[in-house]
């Protein structure tokens, strides 16, 4: 089942359904207005990115299909910055449980991958919390800014976490801890 396992290239007989659920990270009016008007067009750059990246591999020409799912009003579990391995394992289980419950829509098939995008009002925080994508459970929690001017940056973060749900890992230079080019 998707809530336990992951995706392999053999699973790609067709596009993987990616359900994006908007979540308000704050009570700001800007965030609320953004969520009220959120549409699939906010994510249109992600599908071509994956299509271009899949050329030359034995997967479908359109590897992902982004679908907007209803807004979620309950917050996903938050992983504390100082969480150790045990706390992280419990958080992972809690996120999978949350994803299963929060993205269930009567009469609609569940997506293969669930991404919960927590929108924050611009200007409230200089740095957003870390976003995370889990291969086990095919779920991600993404932190993004509300507003059209942030759609490009948000798409990069969403695509990055989506890659993590598919098993990609970050690669960092051990000396300067910067991402390794082009693999990181």
Regions found by a protein language model. Give the residues of each.
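Loop/turn elements at helix/coil->beta-strand transitions in domains of secreted/extracellular proteins
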Residues: 16-19, 109-114, 136-140
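Short intrinsically disordered, low-complexity coil segments enriched in acidic
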Residues: 2-4, 130, 167
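Short acidic alpha-helical/loop segments enriched in Asp/Glu that coordinate divalent cations
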Residues: 61-62, 127-131, 174-178
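The catalytic-center signature of Zn2+-dependent metalloproteases
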Residues: 141-184
